[in-house]
Amino acid sequence: IIPIKEEDIIESLENLKQLQNKISSNNLTDSNKALSLAKEISGIPLIYYPWGLQAAGIRFKNSLQENAKMHAMVEDVVEASHNGIVAWENESQVFPILLQGDKDNIKTKERWKILKIYFDNSKIEYKEIFSIKGNILAKLIHLIYLLDYTSIYKAVISKIDPTPVKSIDFIKSR
């Protein structure tokens, strides 16, 4: 459990207000990070995350599945640097997304660097997303909000209505 202080909540809300103006549907320009990321996602996204940002990575996967109605995967960067890297030896429709923290452990930073070198040498396109600076609550809330919007924009770009969830309704009706 993360110990949360009142100032952590206030910082999170202040960051969220700033982000809201930048990524809302009132700003459909290239400066909208959520929209730009949605345009870049192709194939099957594989979201790599470090320790501490697992919740944001899993939430992004779930949001892409529910809103954009697309397959998505998630994996810890440590595992990606072990067994997960082997899968990249074959051609793939997978698009790696590297969800990085501003204060990742030094060993994690080394893993990111090595993974990017491998992708570059193998001519595998990838996208890096960096958390904001601040407390862990602010980072998680900021990333979740940004990536939720990304999943909605991805749905709209793909001409998919993000609101109905017929398959979930089917399961629930049984």
Q: Where are each of the predicted segments found?
A:
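A SIS-like phosphosugar-recognition module
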Residues: 1-174
